[in-house]
């Protein structure tokens, strides 16, 4: 009984899977893809530029660069003092 019920379900599932894509779902041809490429690249470049500018402005406004510079200065000073004490 289960086999009789599962066979029609299997056939319907296979027919849906093996069905050709509808014309609206078909992949666009290569020439139409190339026509829209410059616009998409320009939009991508503008978006990337805006995001980069925002990130740079956020870094400039934060105190992270000053903290990093101070940390490197202090650490370098400690290392320099350690070398002077060790090798003098």
Swiss-Prot record:
Keywords: Lipid transport, Secreted, Signal, Transport, VLDL
GO annotation terms (biological process): lipid transport; lipoprotein metabolic process; negative regulation of cholesterol transport; negative regulation of lipid catabolic process; negative regulation of very-low-density lipoprotein particle clearance; triglyceride metabolic process; very-low-density lipoprotein particle clearance
Compartments, as annotated in UniProt: Secreted
Signal sequence bounds: 1-26
Gene3D superfamilies per UniProt: Apolipoprotein C-I
Protein name: Apolipoprotein C-I
Role of this protein: Inhibitor of lipoprotein binding to the low density lipoprotein (LDL) receptor, LDL receptor-related protein, and very low density lipoprotein (VLDL) receptor. Associates with high density lipoproteins (HDL) and the triacylglycerol-rich lipoproteins in the plasma and makes up about 10% of the protein of the VLDL and 2% of that of HDL. Appears to interfere directly with fatty acid uptake and is also the major plasma inhibitor of cholesteryl ester transfer protein (CETP). Binds free fatty acids and reduces their intracellular esterification.
Single GO molecular function: phospholipase inhibitor activity
Similarity remark: Belongs to the apolipoprotein C1 family.
Gene this protein is translated from: APOC1
Protein origin, superkingdom: Eukaryota
Stored InterPro entries: ApoC-1_sf, ApoC-I
Source organism of this protein record: Tupaia glis
Main location: secreted
A cellular-component GO term for this protein: very-low-density lipoprotein particle
